[in-house]
């Protein structure tokens, strides 16, 4: 039976990482996969995380299964981080959160819930977007509709066409929004634009789904939640798929969450039973360690402050690299204006490089990036940035 199976295409991002591992040139640089790198080019374990793990090791008494929805304290802390602990959504008990297997797992739960429990047929996804968005919703049989997001000429948000496309979204359609640090462009709506989108959504009856994987890496924990909280303020229903992979550095622990907001507490609780039914058929229950680590940090004032300080350092290092990157490209003779990179948020930048230029960077200089031109700014260090900029100028 299996002899008829054809090979699946390699994932465009994860496949790049495999190619990078086999690269033998000493000056190689990986700007592809989305993990944070520190000034030394490593993906460190945060100090607050390591201390929390030590505490867990000392007090852990069992390896028993978690419940289907995961660690209750983790779920409560996640809601507070998303909406603010004093938000109406939390005070009225309209939100339910379950621990998931990373942000990807949360998105799959969302897709399954929408398909099984609502009448929604269409999901509107920005173009460009993270490639797995389309794959996840195709897997559950939903119809993908695209809305324009990026203006390639201006290297900016294509606001006019975004509104034009989303004005066609019907009542009950799902609209997928990147909460902050849009992947791959790094371009986010302004607070005023978020408010306009929230008003349009409420007026037209969309079901908003936020992919929120980078909270704290744009401008701050509360600042980055502005868009989500604007929607929560005027929507009876919305969904959130969030992750602690990036802002806690817990990539291989697969620590995510799916959050559902309903009109009232009773509907929220009933909906949660269906979410748990979905989880039971997918993976039964989540792993403990990552969620317990996050809950330990967020529950302890000292550890939480240390984590927030470390997160600020990460955010500021990325911003510093953006400025230095633009400065050195100019110094090395780039005729194009790359200043737009400074205005982008988070780990990623849509650099403006073409697929052919990206291929040359890999083949001639051992610099790996996604062919769309997306680069991981967090992969740039003071040790590799001059070689990087010099190489880019040579392929322009």
UniProtKB/Swiss-Prot annotation:
Alphabetized SUPFAM superfamilies for the sequence: PLP-dependent transferases
Keyword Iron-sulfur appears in the UniProt entry = no
Q: Pfam families of this UniProt entry?
A: Aminotran_1_2 (PF00155)
Q: Cofactor(s) for this protein?
A: pyridoxal 5'-phosphate
Instruction: Name the chemical reaction catalysed here.
Output: L-aspartate + 2-oxoglutarate = oxaloacetate + L-glutamate
Q: What InterPro entries does the entry give?
A: Aminotransferase_I/II_large, Asp_trans, NHTrfase_class1_PyrdxlP-BS, PyrdxlP-dep_Trfase, PyrdxlP-dep_Trfase_major, PyrdxlP-dep_Trfase_small
EC annotation from Swiss-Prot or TrEMBL: 2.6.1.1
Q: Does the keyword Hydrolase apply?
A: no
Q: Which GO terms describe its molecular function?
A: identical protein binding; L-aspartate:2-oxoglutarate aminotransferase activity; L-tyrosine-2-oxoglutarate transaminase activity; pyridoxal phosphate binding
Alphabetically list the UniProt keywords. Aminotransferase, Cytoplasm, Pyridoxal phosphate, Transferase
- Residues where L-aspartate binds: 34, 130, 183, 374
GO CC, alphabetical: cytosol
Q: Which Gene3D superfamilies did the record assign?
A: Aspartate Aminotransferase, domain 1, Type I PLP-dependent aspartate aminotransferase-like (Major domain)
GO BP term, example: L-phenylalanine biosynthetic process from chorismate via phenylpyruvate
- Subcellular locations according to the entry: Cytoplasm
Superkingdom of origin: Bacteria
Residues recorded as bearing N6-(pyridoxal phosphate)lysine in the entry: 246
Q: Which EC class heads this enzyme's classification?
A: transferase
Oligomeric state and partners? Homodimer.
For this chain, the family text in UniProt reads: Belongs to the class-I pyridoxal-phosphate-dependent aminotransferase family.
Q: What is this protein called?
A: Aspartate aminotransferase
Organism, per UniProt? Haemophilus influenzae (strain ATCC 51907 / DSM 11121 / KW20 / Rd)
The record lists the lineage as:
Bacteria, Pseudomonadati, Pseudomonadota, Gammaproteobacteria, Pasteurellales
